[in-house]
């Protein structure tokens, strides 16, 4: 048998023409050689390799986006709450994730702190003071905004004086500088327009443009190396612009919220007189347009969805979607079904818009389907029955409420106060949602913070 196999091999190799074609289909090694010879030269080229890799990456990116979109759609119905104990702090107004386990928060009682979501540990951060202390201590204002720059190397928030802008370096939270000569009233909102420039919106109706220069950063590093106590610079604004004031109610032109469109370098602003303003924001601020909002009561929150090119504005009971390229009569609005309590926070994640209300609810709006996510029918024993078609709604826990003199005099007959969702933010994975706030009535003192995952 061995000699016979050898003779066939010799015969096949001796007849490379027709004999090879006849025997090729019967022997794997002849067939594979034949296939290799037929590969076109272009498939071995660098150009073909790069094109193939590009197509593969596009397919992987498309698949990844589909996966993230599906996760964003399914996640809200799976979220479970874990509350944190914040002691006697009063109302968390602002929050941002620093990393996968730390969230930085600002409160009405002017406290800046970091919470570890794994251990629940609270670490307070020293707030930065003006060059010259103000003559009057302002009560009941606090820290309303916290924002990280695009590279996540700097953090902007309010200072000890709520009219001032404070800048910290990340991840150490070392102080860098204070902008303390701009606004005459509280800072309500902040937006970074690049890695070194931020805009602040104030209750005095002005918007300040601030720059953290390389010189400021270098001097800040040098001071930290030689001084045992925190030291920081004091900077002045590059520009200070007033928003247009409505003739009928000029005293209510307070800048309440900001959101930046990085692609077009445009900054959206919402004022409490019910207007949306659009500014070109690069090295200065140039007004582009102002438009009256369809629902103009309690416009206190704003977010920009880059993928959808729309701004989402919260009001007393509605979320309105504005595309500055479209006429104002094309503005679409959806009702939260929680009239009177107000939309207190709003954010985009994939195609889902998360809405936090004054009644302690989290609602989820699907911008593609143009409807709120609905409850799933649960077949679990003992679960609370839900009606088909009900909006999916997550409700915050009890938090902590101070039974002080105000509560005893005016609210002691009310057993439970919902905690308004003043702030919420997703982590980088989109699977954890930090939610915080406190009681809605301004005279009540309390807090709430929780991780939904």
UniProtKB/Swiss-Prot annotation:
In-chain residues carrying the UniProt-annotated modification Phosphoserine: 15
Keywords: Cytoplasm, Cytoskeleton, Nucleus, Phosphoprotein, Repeat, Ubl conjugation pathway, WD repeat
Domain of life: Eukaryota
InterPro entries with a match to the protein in the record: Beta-prop_DCAF12 (IPR056151), DCAF12 (IPR051191), WD40/YVTN_repeat-like_dom_sf (IPR015943), WD40_repeat_CS (IPR019775), WD40_repeat_dom_sf (IPR036322), WD40_rpt (IPR001680)
Gene Ontology CC terms, in alphabetical order: centrosome; Cul4-RING E3 ubiquitin ligase complex; cytosol; nucleus
GO molecular function: ubiquitin-like ligase-substrate adaptor activity
One Pfam assignment: Beta-prop_DCAF12
WD repeat ranges per the UniProt record: 138-178, 182-220, 250-289, 338-375
Xref: SMART domains: WD40
Disruption phenotype: Knockout mice are born at expected Mendelian ratios and manifest no apparent physical abnormalities. Mutants have testes that produce fewer mature sperms, an altered percentage of CD4(+) T-cells and natural killer (NK) cells as well as increased splenocyte apoptosis after T cell activation.
Chief location bin: cytoplasm
Entries under PROSITE patterns matching the protein: WD_REPEATS_1 (PS00678), WD_REPEATS_2 (PS50082), WD_REPEATS_REGION (PS50294)
Region (Disordered): 1-34
Assembly mode: Component of the DCX(DCAF12) E3 ubiquitin ligase complex, at least composed of CUL4 (CUL4A or CUL4B), DDB1, DCAF12 and RBX1.
Chain's role: Substrate-recognition component of a DCX (DDB1-CUL4-X-box) E3 ubiquitin-protein ligase complex of the DesCEND (destruction via C-end degrons) pathway, which recognizes a C-degron located at the extreme C terminus of target proteins, leading to their ubiquitination and degradation. The C-degron recognized by the DesCEND pathway is usually a motif of less than ten residues and can be present in full-length proteins, truncated proteins or proteolytically cleaved forms.
Family: Belongs to the WD repeat DCAF12 family.
Name of the protein in question: DDB1- and CUL4-associated factor 12
Organism: Mus musculus (Mouse)
The encoding gene: Dcaf12
């Amino acid at each position: 048998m061995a000699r016979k196999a050898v003779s066939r091999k010799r015969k096949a190799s001796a007849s490379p023409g027709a004999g090879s074609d006849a025997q090729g289909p019967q022997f794997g090694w002849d067939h594979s050689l034949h296939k290799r010879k037929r590969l076109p030269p272009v498939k071995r080229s660098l150009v073909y390799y790069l094109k193939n890799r590009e197509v593969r990456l596009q397919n992987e990116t498309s698949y990844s986006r589909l996966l993230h979109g599906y996760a964003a759609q399914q996640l809200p119905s799976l979220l479970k709450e874990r509350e944190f104990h914040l002691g006697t702090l009063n109302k968390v107004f602002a929050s941002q994730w620093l990393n996968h386990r730390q969230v930085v928060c600002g409160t009405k009682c002017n406290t800046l702190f970091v919470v570890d979501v794994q251990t629940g540990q609270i670490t307070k951060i020293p707030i930065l003071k003006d060059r010259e202390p103000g003559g009057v201590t302002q009560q009941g204002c606090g820290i309303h905004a916290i924002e990280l720059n695009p590279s996540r190397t700097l953090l902007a928030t309010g200072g000890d004086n709520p009219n001032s802008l404070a800048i910290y370096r990340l991840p150490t939270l070392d102080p860098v500088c204070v902008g303390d000569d701009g606004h005459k009233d509280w800072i309500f909102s902040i937006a970074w327009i690049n890695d070194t420039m931020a805009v602040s919106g104030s209750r005095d109706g002005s918007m300040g443009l601030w720059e953290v220069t390389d010189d400021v950063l270098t001097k800040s590093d040098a001071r930290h190396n030689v001084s045992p106590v925190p030291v920081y610079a004091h900077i002045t604004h590059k520009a200070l612009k007033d928003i247009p004031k409505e003739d009928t109610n000029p005293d209510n032109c307070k800048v309440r919220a900001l959101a930046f469109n990085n692609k077009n370098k445009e900054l959206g602003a919402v004022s409490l007189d019910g207007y949306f303003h659009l500014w070109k924001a690069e090295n200065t601020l140039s007004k582009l347009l102002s438009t009256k909002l369809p629902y103009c009561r309690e416009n206190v929150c704003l977010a920009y969805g880059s993928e959808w090119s729309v701004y989402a504005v919260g009001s007393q009971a509605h979320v309105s979607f504005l595309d500055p390229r479209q006429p104002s009569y094309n503005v679409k609005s959806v009702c939260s079904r929680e009239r009177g309590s107000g939309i207190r926070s709003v954010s985009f994640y994939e195609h889902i818009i998360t809405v936090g209300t004054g009644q302690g609810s989290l609602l989820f709006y699907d911008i593609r389907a143009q409807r709120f996510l609905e409850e799933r029918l649960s077949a679990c024993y003992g679960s609370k029955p839900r009606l088909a078609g009900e909006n999916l709604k997550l409700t915050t826990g009890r938090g902590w409420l101070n039974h002080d003199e105000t509560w005893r005099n005016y609210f002691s007959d009310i057993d439970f106060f919902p905690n308004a969702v003043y702030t919420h933010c997703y982590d980088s994975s989109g699977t954890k949602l930090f939610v915080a706030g406190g009681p809605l009535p301004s005279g009540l003192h309390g807090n709430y913070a929780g991780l939904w995952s």
